[in-house]
């Protein structure tokens, strides 16, 4: 927990969001992960046309400086700012709205009609249900609606 009693991710999100907006960036998310012996605090940003090194560096400088002030002994070893990647996760309602018509892969916690992974064109998130038209696998061409509570993850689908 951070000093204020908030989770570190929430604190960083509140701190970074206005700076990201001022730079014309969208704050996609914040995560604290352990990889091997190290803990990484990662801030993910995006913008129309994609982000570049200069965007990441600009946000990193201002947020890292503020974190140094409020967290003299940070609970992480490395701070990173980056793009969410081509296969970016869809977490917020705004993410689902932004990527309507795009190909996505949705994974459920438990099998639905015998499967846990669905690839299709995102139709939207309406009334707590993720709707997609399947483009691969069992049920190809069908439109399905999954309760958002069933969804373990949703990501943009990358084709090579």
UniProtKB/Swiss-Prot annotation:
GO cellular component assignments: cytosol
Main location: cytoplasm
InterPro entries, sorted: Ribosome_maturation_RimP, RimP_C, RimP_C_sf, RimP_N, RimP_N_sf
Residues forming coiled coils: none
Compartments where located: Cytoplasm
Name of a matching Pfam family: DUF150_C
One biological process term in Gene Ontology: ribosomal small subunit assembly
Domain of life: Bacteria
Entry keywords, A to Z: Cytoplasm, Ribosome biogenesis
Known function: Required for maturation of 30S ribosomal subunits.
Family assignment from sequence similarity: Belongs to the RimP family.
The protein's name in its UniProt record: Ribosome maturation factor RimP
Source organism of the structure: Symbiobacterium thermophilum (strain DSM 24528 / JCM 14929 / IAM 14863 / T)
